Swiss-Prot record:
Its main location: cytoplasm. It is found in: Cytoplasm. Gene3D superfamilies: Ribosomal RNA adenine dimethylase-like, domain 2, Vaccinia Virus protein VP39. This is Probable ribosomal RNA small subunit methyltransferase A. It comes from Methanococcus vannielii (strain ATCC 35089 / DSM 1224 / JCM 13029 / OCM 148 / SB). It comes from the Archaea. The lineage of its organism: Archaea, Methanobacteriati, Methanobacteriota, Methanomada group, Methanococci.
């Protein structure tokens, strides 16, 4: 079967990396696992041998022969034919995620995962995307993604994966990353507002916090001039002259809380 470029299909063929991903997830007979992207089922079969149940979300119906073969062999596998971004993941009740993700949905599907409860996720990404996930302040890789993930997950870079591990060979290197959910490192007054602040400031990561906030005031649903007034009133509460890319995640949390208490709660 010819893989779809539109769907970003690169099937993982190298069994060494399949085994490495599964070992990193520490799958047991009590685990309910979510996989996004069936491929030809190399990963699915290995998961099914170990897990209590495996849900696979796949959009490409051309892969149905592979799905039927796997489900006839393993009764603990269910394939959901849908767009993973449209599926209500909360209904599935999984506790682990193991997937070779379609790279064009890496960002939205990762943010969707983070909105759900899980213990561990072992995921394949483009190498450059993976570096952003583990990005630290004052580095080129530090981003909204870095802060969003590190807020309530430990991130571990497992290994780099060469193009030769896939069919067809992608043009870039890939990487396996492990996310372990945990309690947040710092208190957030309102998580939706926190995400809005992240969206606002990282649109202008090289600017000062003040300039970034003003230029993206719409992300926080506040008029630009009103925000200027508020920032003037709270200028002693935070160093708004700092550059966005230098702010540690906990400082961004502090910024979010100050803004929330002075914007939303006083409306």
């Amino acid at each position: 079967m010819k893989q779809s470029k539109k769907l970003g299909q690169c099937f993982l063929k190298d069994k060494n990396f399949v085994k490495k991903a599964i070992k990193s997830a520490d799958i047991t007979e009590n685990d309910i696992v979510l996989e996004v992207g069936l491929g030809e089922g190399a990963l699915t079969k290995e998961l099914a041998k170990l897990a209590k149940f495996v849900y696979v979300i796949e959009l490409d119906m051309r892969l149905e022969p592979f799905a039927n073969q796997i489900m006839s062999e393993f009764k603990n596998v269910k394939v959901i034919w849908n767009d993973a971004l449209k599926v209500d993941l909360k209904e599935l009740g999984f506790n682990k995620i193991v997937a070779n993700l379609p790279y064009q949905i890496s960002s939205p599907i990762t943010f969707k995962f983070l909105e759900n409860d899980f213990d561990v996720a072992v995921l394949m990404y483009q190498y450059e995307f993976a570096k952003r996930m583990i990005g630290k302040p004052d580095t080129d890789e530090y981003s909204r993604l870095s802060v969003s993930i590190q807020y309530n997950s430990d991130v571990e870079f497992i290994c780099k994966v060469p193009p030769t591990a896939f069919s067809p060979k992608p043009d870039v290197n890939s990487a396996i990353v492990k996310l372990t959910k945990r309690e947040p490192l710092f208190h957030i007054e309102n998580e939706e507002f926190f995400r809005n602040v992240l969206n606002a400031i990282f649109q202008h990561r090289n600017r000062t916090v003040k300039r970034a906030l003003i230029d993206s005031s719409h992300e926080m649903n506040i008029e630009r001039e009103r925000l200027k007034e508020i920032l003037e009133n709270i200028k002693l509460d935070f160093d708004f002259s700092e550059r966005v890319f230098k702010l540690a995640p906990e400082k961004i949390g502090e910024l979010s809380n100050i803004l929330y208490l002075n914007i939303i709660s006083k409306k």
